[in-house]
Amino acid sequence: MKNRIEAIKQQIDAFELNSADKLEAFRLQFLVRKGSIAELFNQLKELSPVDRPEYGQRLNKLKKFAESTYEEAEKKLDVLASGKGKQHRDLTLPGRRQYTGSEHPVQQVLGDMKQIFKAMGFTIATGPELELDSYNFDKLNFPSNHPARDMQDTFFITKNGKDDDLLLRTHTSPVQIRVMLDEKPPIRVICPGKVYRNEAISARSYCVFHQLEGLYIDKRVSFADLKATIYSFAKQMFGSDVQLRFRPSFFPFTEPSAEVDVTCYLCGGKGCRVCKQSGWLEILGCGMVHPNVLRNCSIDPDEYSGFAFGMGVDRTALLRYKIDDIRLLFENDVRMLEQFSR
């Protein structure tokens, strides 16, 4: 039996397993119940009890060797059949282009905004996107019946009519409240971040967008300081030729309040469909911080005054890159985004 085992091992070594037919022939010869290895197992009962354990171990090793040889050959044939094993390479072909990533247009604009305001002496403050009702509305002088506090305009997480109601912040103004509660004047900060509004998605509006707000609190701060800050920002952001106008407006947290427009990027102020024939596009809202807001943050309005402003980063990106649909900024279409890489 010893010679027979050795002979079968040599047959296994010499077997050419280079096709599916030969692989099947190997299986039929060595691995089936009527194969040569199985026949040797049947002959074990003819051996003496002394020799039977030794040859049983040898046969088990032979069987495992045959099975492993079969499995390895089967894997190689599967790889070749799928084409993964082919090594045909034309080394004369040019290499594939390596695409490099770039900053998203919104992040580019936000980065430029930060640099402009940092050069003016502003620091950066951030806060939670899941905010308390009291920080988002009450401390900002919003009356209890203000439309913004309705479920149709704000994403409420919990709404029990209490100060501890949770919501997705509708602006980054709560960050200003947190700063005024934690720090003493003078305060000069910008607050960038995501905000959420329960709005219908369209070419001009989205349910989530990026906002940057600014706050300056000190003694004898005036509206002239606010205008100088906005003018300086706009000239650096949109170019020295841009024209601005301030329009009276209303916000609960500022008094007086204004909205700021710049000349339309598409028509240069002549009037077109983007600016609705007005020649102007709104870029931000601003005003002097309301005395009630200062009092809510334990700041004496008789001693200190300040201004605040807020702008949509996404809308500014639309203006800068002449994009006419805000939804394009959120679709992550690389073909569109790579046009604005720098």
UniProtKB/Swiss-Prot annotation:
Cofactor descriptive note: Binds 2 magnesium ions per tetramer.
SUPFAM superfamilies recorded: Class II aaRS and biotin synthetases, tRNA-binding arm
Entry protein name: Phenylalanine--tRNA ligase alpha subunit
Keywords from the named record: Aminoacyl-tRNA synthetase, ATP-binding, Cytoplasm, Ligase, Magnesium, Metal-binding, Nucleotide-binding, Protein biosynthesis
Family designation: Belongs to the class-II aminoacyl-tRNA synthetase family. Phe-tRNA synthetase alpha subunit type 1 subfamily.
Keyword Magnesium among record annotations: yes
Coiled-coil blocks: none
Enzyme class: ligase
Catalytic activity entry: tRNA(Phe) + L-phenylalanine + ATP = L-phenylalanyl-tRNA(Phe) + AMP + diphosphate + H(+)
UniProt superkingdom: Bacteria
One cellular component (GO) term of this entry: cytoplasm
One Pfam family hit: tRNA-synt_2d
The keyword Aminoacyl-tRNA synthetase is assigned to this record: yes
An example molecular function term from Gene Ontology annotations: magnesium ion binding
HAMAP family given in the database record: Phe_tRNA_synth_alpha1 (MF_00281)
Binding site for Mg(2+): 255
Compartments (UniProt record): Cytoplasm
Primary localization: cytoplasm
Entry EC no(s): 6.1.1.20
Any Gene Ontology biological process: phenylalanyl-tRNA aminoacylation
Protein species of origin: Chlorobium phaeobacteroides (strain BS1)
InterPro entries named in the record: aa-tRNA-synth_II, aa-tRNA-synth_II/BPL/LPL, Phe-tRNA-synth_IIc_asu, Phe-tRNA_ligase_II_N, Phe_tRNA_ligase_alpha1_bac, Phenylalanyl-tRNA_Synthase, tRNA-bd_arm
